[in-house]
């Protein structure tokens, strides 16, 4: 397994030497500046690749090995008028990446909103801060700020009472911050920042699309792109929904083991794989992460390793330290390592320590939400320690125990 680091480019304030010092060898990056639906050119890719891979004397090299993500446009997700054009641009971007030896591509199929949190600086018991999804605050946004048509039917009376109490206690600053957190697109999102009116309009464009319809559109997309990916040796890795359930009445179709099984059955192409994100899938108590990893091991080409802690009835959660929370990280790494040992060197699983607590010096710095250096470095070191220990006792390990 190869250790990677998500890098948002030189503007994000994380020098590549910091990545080296964290112990990573591979970079996960993307051309976030290119508008959704527009083709990535070879010149743009080469410029970013050279920036990453030009190695100063005496430094160890870094390799741009994973793209996260080429955005999938709303027209593709809705099978809209521009779907054919946007799929063509997506394929052209994939071909340009493959020509530059970047052959693992992460993407998602979440409509309107990408990954979603209500609180970007939840204070933990150590004084570090973490990201959190508070179900009641989310409901307050949906019911009283967004005022989504028909939202009431998605919440129980108890939920509605709690949401109103939270909303009535919020001042204007808190309301604006919640809008920013939910509607303005978190770092790495493949959806666009939205004003409240634009948010409502975008939701209306999905009014006639249920889960079965969205899944058909995903299958149509994969049927178009996987033959090209297979011919190029590219691996496509579908990221789970985050959180893995419906938001705003929208369908989500990559939330469970059954969801992925249906996708792989519909499009069994070798290039059709998954990004195994333990933090996203782990939010659901009914997702057995080791079982999912074991079942789909051959299709896992990229992994986000992080943990979450469910609160109350499980709909509220916060991001835990990497070896804490509700994720059996040791058990999962055992399965991934077992799979990785079966593979040729060029097909190794690439992973990154996903997200991280904001701690120590990072508490005083402007950081990319979810992606502070120190918290991610700590997580990567902890994961590396598990891998080193498991490798050392590999001959003694029985995966059936």
UniProtKB/Swiss-Prot annotation:
It is an enzyme of class 4 (lyase). GO terms for molecular function: ferrous iron binding; manganese ion binding; mannonate dehydratase activity. The keyword Endoplasmic reticulum does not apply. This is Mannonate dehydratase. Belongs to the mannonate dehydratase family. Gene3D superfamilies: Divalent-metal-dependent TIM barrel enzymes. HAMAP family: UxuA. Its cofactor is Fe(2+); Mn(2+). GO terms for biological process: D-glucuronate catabolic process. It comes from Brucella canis (strain ATCC 23365 / NCTC 10854 / RM-666). The gene is uxuA. The keyword Phosphoprotein does not apply. Catalyzes the dehydration of D-mannonate.
